[in-house]
Amino acid sequence: TQAAEVRESISLTGQFAAVDEVLTGRENLVLVARLRHLKEPGAIADDLLRRFSLAEAGTRRVATYSGGMRRRLDIAMSLIGNPQVIFLDEPTTGLDPEARIEVWQAVKELAKGGTTVLLTTQYLDEAEHLADRLAILHEGRIIVNGTLDELKQLLPPAKIEYVEKQPSLEDVFLTLVGAKTDKEQR
Protein backbone atom coordinates (compact mmCIF):
# COMPACT_ATOMS: atom_id res chain seq x y z
CA THR A 1 0.00 0.00 0.00
CA GLN A 2 1.01 3.61 -0.38
CA ALA A 3 1.04 4.16 3.40
CA ALA A 4 3.44 1.24 3.86
CA GLU A 5 5.75 2.64 1.18
CA VAL A 6 5.79 6.02 2.90
CA ARG A 7 6.59 4.38 6.26
CA GLU A 8 9.44 2.44 4.64
CA SER A 9 10.96 5.66 3.29
CA ILE A 10 11.09 7.42 6.69
CA SER A 11 13.22 6.68 9.74
CA LEU A 12 13.49 8.27 13.19
CA THR A 13 16.31 8.56 15.68
CA GLY A 14 15.11 9.74 19.06
CA GLN A 15 16.78 12.10 21.49
CA PHE A 16 18.45 9.24 23.36
CA ALA A 17 20.33 6.40 21.69
CA ALA A 18 18.06 3.35 21.38
CA VAL A 19 20.76 0.69 21.24
CA ASP A 20 20.98 -2.60 23.11
CA GLU A 21 24.05 -2.26 25.34
CA VAL A 22 24.32 -6.03 25.91
CA LEU A 23 24.85 -6.66 22.20
CA THR A 24 27.82 -5.64 20.09
CA GLY A 25 27.49 -2.80 17.62
CA ARG A 26 27.37 -5.28 14.75
CA GLU A 27 24.73 -7.41 16.50
CA ASN A 28 22.53 -4.33 16.96
CA LEU A 29 22.70 -3.59 13.24
CA VAL A 30 22.13 -7.21 12.21
CA LEU A 31 19.10 -7.40 14.52
CA VAL A 32 17.45 -4.36 12.91
CA ALA A 33 18.21 -5.65 9.39
CA ARG A 34 16.61 -8.99 10.27
CA LEU A 35 13.57 -7.28 11.79
CA ARG A 36 13.16 -5.41 8.49
CA HIS A 37 13.44 -8.76 6.62
CA LEU A 38 16.43 -7.59 4.57
CA LYS A 39 18.78 -9.92 2.72
CA GLU A 40 22.39 -10.17 3.89
CA PRO A 41 22.04 -8.47 7.30
CA GLY A 42 25.72 -9.10 8.08
CA ALA A 43 26.88 -7.27 4.94
CA ILE A 44 24.51 -4.38 5.72
CA ALA A 45 25.91 -4.18 9.27
CA ASP A 46 29.52 -4.24 8.08
CA ASP A 47 28.85 -1.50 5.52
CA LEU A 48 27.22 0.78 8.12
CA LEU A 49 29.99 0.13 10.65
CA ARG A 50 32.51 1.29 8.02
CA ARG A 51 30.43 4.33 6.98
CA PHE A 52 30.15 5.50 10.59
CA SER A 53 33.78 4.80 11.56
CA LEU A 54 32.76 2.00 13.92
CA ALA A 55 34.34 -0.99 12.14
CA GLU A 56 37.02 -1.51 14.80
CA ALA A 57 34.42 -1.28 17.59
CA GLY A 58 31.83 -3.45 15.84
CA THR A 59 32.64 -6.58 17.84
CA ARG A 60 32.64 -4.80 21.21
CA ARG A 61 29.60 -4.57 23.44
CA VAL A 62 27.83 -1.25 23.07
CA ALA A 63 28.13 -0.73 26.85
CA THR A 64 31.83 0.05 26.21
CA TYR A 65 31.07 2.73 23.57
CA SER A 66 31.43 6.46 24.16
CA GLY A 67 28.36 8.70 23.85
CA GLY A 68 29.35 9.77 20.35
CA MET A 69 29.85 6.18 19.24
CA ARG A 70 26.40 5.22 20.58
CA ARG A 71 24.76 8.12 18.74
CA ARG A 72 26.54 7.18 15.49
CA LEU A 73 25.44 3.57 15.92
CA ASP A 74 21.87 4.72 16.61
CA ILE A 75 21.87 6.83 13.44
CA ALA A 76 23.36 3.90 11.49
CA MET A 77 20.55 1.67 12.76
CA SER A 78 18.04 4.23 11.48
CA LEU A 79 19.55 4.00 8.01
CA ILE A 80 18.94 0.28 7.60
CA GLY A 81 16.66 -0.10 4.61
CA ASN A 82 17.98 3.13 3.04
CA PRO A 83 15.21 5.53 4.06
CA GLN A 84 14.90 8.65 1.93
CA VAL A 85 14.06 10.80 4.96
CA ILE A 86 15.49 10.60 8.49
CA PHE A 87 14.27 12.55 11.51
CA LEU A 88 16.96 13.25 14.12
CA ASP A 89 15.59 14.51 17.43
CA GLU A 90 18.32 16.48 19.21
CA PRO A 91 21.09 14.08 18.13
CA THR A 92 23.87 15.77 20.15
CA THR A 93 22.09 16.45 23.44
CA GLY A 94 24.35 15.47 26.33
CA LEU A 95 27.43 14.78 24.20
CA ASP A 96 30.88 16.22 24.81
CA PRO A 97 32.29 18.60 22.15
CA GLU A 98 34.32 15.88 20.43
CA ALA A 99 31.32 13.54 20.19
CA ARG A 100 29.14 16.40 18.89
CA ILE A 101 31.56 16.93 16.02
CA GLU A 102 31.50 13.19 15.24
CA VAL A 103 27.71 13.29 14.97
CA TRP A 104 27.86 16.50 12.89
CA GLN A 105 30.16 14.71 10.43
CA ALA A 106 27.73 11.79 10.18
CA VAL A 107 24.79 14.13 9.53
CA LYS A 108 26.73 16.03 6.85
CA GLU A 109 27.62 12.74 5.12
CA LEU A 110 23.96 11.69 5.11
CA ALA A 111 22.88 14.94 3.49
CA LYS A 112 25.75 14.79 1.00
CA GLY A 113 24.62 11.26 0.08
CA GLY A 114 21.10 12.44 -0.77
CA THR A 115 19.22 11.59 2.42
CA THR A 116 16.80 14.29 3.54
CA VAL A 117 17.61 15.05 7.18
CA LEU A 118 15.07 16.77 9.43
CA LEU A 119 16.85 17.71 12.64
CA THR A 120 15.62 19.28 15.86
CA THR A 121 18.13 21.03 18.08
CA GLN A 122 18.33 23.55 20.88
CA TYR A 123 21.88 24.44 19.85
CA LEU A 124 21.71 27.33 17.39
CA ASP A 125 25.35 26.86 16.34
CA GLU A 126 24.45 23.29 15.39
CA ALA A 127 21.58 24.51 13.23
CA GLU A 128 23.93 26.99 11.52
CA HIS A 129 26.50 24.25 10.79
CA LEU A 130 24.13 21.55 9.59
CA ALA A 131 21.01 23.07 8.05
CA ASP A 132 20.46 24.43 4.58
CA ARG A 133 16.96 25.51 5.65
CA LEU A 134 15.83 26.48 9.14
CA ALA A 135 12.49 26.75 10.92
CA ILE A 136 12.36 28.52 14.27
CA LEU A 137 9.73 27.34 16.72
CA HIS A 138 8.50 29.49 19.58
CA GLU A 139 5.80 28.34 21.98
CA GLY A 140 4.95 25.40 19.73
CA ARG A 141 4.56 27.39 16.50
CA ILE A 142 6.87 27.98 13.55
CA ILE A 143 7.45 31.73 13.59
CA VAL A 144 9.84 31.91 10.62
CA ASN A 145 11.58 29.60 8.17
CA GLY A 146 14.11 29.95 5.38
CA THR A 147 17.81 29.78 4.69
CA LEU A 148 20.27 31.23 7.19
CA ASP A 149 20.92 34.17 4.85
CA GLU A 150 17.18 34.84 4.53
CA LEU A 151 16.75 34.81 8.30
CA LYS A 152 19.73 37.12 8.83
CA GLN A 153 18.16 39.63 6.43
CA LEU A 154 15.28 40.02 8.90
CA LEU A 155 17.64 41.91 11.21
CA PRO A 156 19.02 45.42 10.69
CA PRO A 157 22.52 45.66 9.17
CA ALA A 158 25.27 44.85 11.64
CA LYS A 159 27.68 47.44 12.96
CA ILE A 160 31.29 46.33 12.44
CA GLU A 161 33.58 46.48 15.45
CA TYR A 162 37.00 44.94 15.97
CA VAL A 163 36.92 42.51 18.87
CA GLU A 164 39.85 40.26 19.65
CA LYS A 165 38.58 36.69 19.72
CA GLN A 166 39.71 34.61 22.61
CA PRO A 167 39.58 30.83 22.32
CA SER A 168 36.43 29.28 23.76
CA LEU A 169 36.55 26.50 26.33
CA GLU A 170 35.50 24.14 23.53
CA ASP A 171 38.51 25.27 21.45
CA VAL A 172 40.82 24.62 24.43
CA PHE A 173 39.31 21.17 25.07
CA LEU A 174 39.53 20.09 21.43
CA THR A 175 43.13 21.33 21.16
CA LEU A 176 44.15 19.46 24.32
CA VAL A 177 42.60 16.16 23.20
CA GLY A 178 44.00 16.55 19.69
CA ALA A 179 40.62 16.62 17.95
CA LYS A 180 39.97 18.71 14.88
CA THR A 181 37.33 21.37 15.19
CA ASP A 182 34.50 21.47 12.68
CA LYS A 183 36.16 24.45 10.93
CA GLU A 184 39.46 22.56 10.52
CA GLN A 185 37.70 19.58 8.91
CA ARG A 186 36.12 21.62 6.10
Tell what function each PLM region has.
Residues 145-146:
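ABC ATPase "signature
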Residues 86-89:
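Catalytic Walker B motif of ABC-type/P-loop ATPase nucleotide-binding domains
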Residues 100-113:
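Helical segment within the ABC ATPase nucleotide-binding domain
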Residues 82:
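Conserved catalytic motifs of ABC-family nucleotide-binding domains
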Residues 11, 30, 34-57:
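Conserved ABC ATPase "signature" region
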